[in-house]
């Protein structure tokens, strides 16, 4: 599977512009042969635009998802619609299974190239340190996976990277690739270099850590989106500017590495 990480530029609370950039990145990635394109955390509004969360919240299948789904179908490519701020009440009214019937969640949706929804993941670990996320949002409860391009794919979001037990649970359910939409800021750039790589090494799987690019009143995003292979080797990486990076991620590589170095079999 050819995985593209779309490190799009994000403007605070400018939904239409941000989604247009995302659609453009999907088109570019598909033209370069991508099978799956991953977008960053809250790419449509900006993670640090906390004052806009309620105003720009959408149900699953709302405006942002409709536009991203249409791009996936048009360009024949699977798309992880990063995350958006989900209006749980509106989703519940539309018949979606939700962790609460009111409030907001930080929600990722994976569409396949036919536009079918394959996975919905709501961020489990909400960030409270110098962030309003933990005050504003409802955490998710489920750890879904989906079959895509020969991989068993899961999604975790940004701060989830600091909780390795989450990834071990995913390995136990057969996961071979984890996509990590993020809004990682300075000054914790060294943590961003370390944590996705550590999760790949520990669990002998692919990690696609996709960050945004842009500046907010309280933080600047570090960019540096990277695909790590099951040895933890960076096989595609960016700097901090808006760009798309792509890597071939053959599922058989996971099998090869786990057979060559069967550390997962030695757990006690």
Model feature map: region roles:
Residues 15, 24-114, 120, 186-189, ...:
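Cys-nucleophile CN-hydrolase/nitrilase-fold catalytic domain and related Cys-dependent amidase chemistry
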Residues 70, 90, 94-173, 187-188, ...:
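Active-site catalytic loop in hydrolytic enzyme cores
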Residues 1-5:
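Extreme N-terminal starter segment of soluble prokaryotic enzymes
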Residues 35-36, 151-153, 177:
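Structural motif
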Residues 81-83, 106-110, 144-146, 225-227, ...:
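Short beta-strand scaffold segments in enzyme catalytic cores
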Residues 14, 111-113, 222, 229-230:
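Short, acidic, Ser/Thr-enriched surface-loop or helix-capping motifs
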Residues 124-127, 240-244:
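A short acidic/small-residue loop/turn micro-motif
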Residues 63-78, 162-243:
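CN hydrolase (nitrilase-like) catalytic-core segments centered on the catalytic cysteine
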């Amino acid at each position: 599977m050819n995985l593209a990480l779309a490190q799009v530029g994000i403007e605070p609370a400018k939904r239409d512009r941000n989604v247009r950039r995302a659609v453009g990145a999907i088109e570019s990635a598909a033209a370069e042969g991508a099978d799956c394109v991953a977008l960053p955390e809250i790419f449509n509004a900006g993670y640090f635009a906390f004052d806009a969360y309620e105003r720009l919240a959408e149900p699953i299948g709302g405006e942002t998802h409709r536009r991203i789904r249409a791009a996936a179908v048009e360009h024949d490519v699977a798309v992880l619609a990063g995350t958006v701020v989900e209006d749980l009440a509106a989703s519940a009214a539309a018949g979606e299974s939700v962790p609460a019937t009111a409030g907001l969640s930080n929600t990722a949706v994976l569409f396949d190239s036919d536009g079918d929804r394959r996975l919905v993941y709501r961020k489990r670990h909400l960030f409270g340190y110098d962030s309003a996320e933990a005050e504003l949002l409802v955490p998710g409860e489920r750890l879904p996976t989906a079959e895509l391009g020969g991989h068993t794919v899961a999604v975790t979001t940004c701060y989830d990277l600091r909780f390795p037990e989450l990834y071990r649970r995913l390995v136990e359910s057969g996961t071979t690739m984890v996509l990590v939409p993020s809004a990682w800021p300075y000054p914790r750039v060294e943590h961003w270099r370390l944590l996705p790589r550590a999760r790949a090494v520990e669990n002998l799987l692919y990690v696609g850590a996709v960050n945004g690019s842009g500046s907010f009143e309280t933080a600047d995003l570090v960019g540096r989106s990277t695909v790590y292979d099951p040895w933890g080797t960076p096989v595609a990486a960016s700097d901090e500017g808006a760009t798309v990076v792509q890597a071939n991620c053959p599922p058989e590589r996971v099998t090869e590495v786990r057979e060559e170095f069967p550390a997962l079999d030695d757990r006690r």
